[in-house]
Amino acid sequence: MWESKFAKESLTFDDVLLIPAQSDILPKDVDLSVQLSDKVKLNIPVISAGMDTVTESKMAIAMARQGGLGVIHKNMGVEEQADEVQKVKRSENGVISNPFFLTPEESVYEAEALMGKYRISGVPIVDNKEDRNLVGILTNRDLRFIEDFSIKIVDVMTQENLITAPVNTTLEEAEKILQKHKIEKLPLVKDGRLEGLITIKDIEKVIEFPNAAKDEHGRLLVAAAIGISKDTDIRAQKLVEAGVDVLVIDTAHGHSKGVIDQVKHIKKTYPEITLVAGNVATAEATKDLFEAGADIVKVGIGPGSICTTRVVAGVGVPQITAIYDCATEARKHGKAIIADGGIKFSGDIIKALAAGGHAVMLGSLLAGTEESPGATEIFQGRQYKVYRGMGSLGAMEKGSNDRYFQEDKAPKKFVPEGIEGRTAYKGALQDTIYQLMGGVRAGMGYTGSHDLRELREEAQFTRMGPAGLAESHPHNIQITKESPNYSF
């Protein structure tokens, strides 16, 4: 051990370039999909970080519609986080197999509250919660001129000439029925009992977002972060009940006894849920987490733009080497890793994927988008959004202190491993994803990679020094017009 203390040399994104290779594939024809686990397939290899200025339900919905995945952060109460997951799962459905419903004796106020909370324009009405026989439907049109919200639903709901369909109705058949009768919601019934619901909005979304990442029921995929704190059991339970597809045990040091024990416990309790564990930076850590039961391991100790772990704690592994080492171990298990942190450009994404990552997790590149929950600020006439690390003092005070194993410390005793700042406002997420995936497609075209598996297996790197990096960026010119995919 003593003799090998300085034996390892490590590389990061700015130390390497991919070598171009003979290609017979055009960028527009490459396959960006990735199978992360038996139940989770993404159509782009991008995951938004579980950070309180990056991902809540709005971001997770937008990410899934683009074909990626969003991780709902845990800097909120258990019920609130579960509610955020529900918003994603109910935002879009092929067929809503478990629709909301109310009974005739409930008040219009309760209907208005339910519809407002989940942003739905109507709700089926059943005789009672046990039998669930459909007796009516309540829509915004029924409520348009209501002034007294204390009246019962039975007094205003539509009861006559209800249009319904059997439970095995396809989306194509449903669309024809909806158009024929000029209605927006089609209850699915069996022997009069409400069994499902198809809406015109969901059909329109299928057409508008054909690349969306969905579960087997046609609902958007969503992930949520948990930790190793006292509320983890109840948090995991509520998230699973809300329909979460992926649980992410999110800590700063995944190669620790507490995390390994938590992986074993969560996987035993919820074997059907895809489980991500991290963060780590070595093959040994990857091996231990996979053997404990993790389906996916998240890689990255300190590479993030808002992370100070490497300078505060003096610990980490430059990210390209960390990805490669962990991927080498993951190959032995036939499992996936996520490259988390350090990505500044689309070129870094393809480097991370070529080094062995199955997907990348992004924070700073997405924090400036409209869908992120960070507050908007105006600074020197330009629009920005607040972005902070989960190891920053503000985030730790709000609840992320357990991520850094400081759960029992008073706020004045926190030792932060991150900073708070601002990032330029970028507009809609879909525009950012378009540019990022355009860069990945271009890189795959240059390397002759038809899909991400081929990129991982066949692409080769060359190392470069500071002069090579300087040569790689625009030089000997003053940039006068900002590019949508480059800022330095």
Swiss-Prot record:
Keyword Oxidoreductase attached: yes
Oligomeric form and interacting partners: Homotetramer.
Role: Catalyzes the conversion of inosine 5'-phosphate (IMP) to xanthosine 5'-phosphate (XMP), the first committed and rate-limiting step in the de novo synthesis of guanine nucleotides, and therefore plays an important role in the regulation of cell growth.
Originating organism: Staphylococcus aureus (strain NCTC 8325 / PS 47)
Gene behind this protein: guaB
Protein keywords: CBS domain, GMP biosynthesis, Metal-binding, NAD, Oxidoreductase, Potassium, Purine biosynthesis, Repeat
Catalytic-site annotation from UniProt: C307 (thioimidate intermediate), R403 (proton acceptor)
Region (Disordered): 468-488
Any GO molecular function: nucleotide binding
Protein name according to UniProt: Inosine-5'-monophosphate dehydrogenase
Regions of compositional bias (Polar residues) in chain numbering: 475-488
Regulation of its activity: Mycophenolic acid (MPA) is a non-competitive inhibitor that prevents formation of the closed enzyme conformation by binding to the same site as the amobile flap. In contrast, mizoribine monophosphate (MZP) is a competitive inhibitor that induces the closed conformation. MPA is a potent inhibitor of mammalian IMPDHs but a poor inhibitor of the bacterial enzymes. MZP is a more potent inhibitor of bacterial IMPDH.
CDD domains: CBS_pair_IMPDH, IMPDH
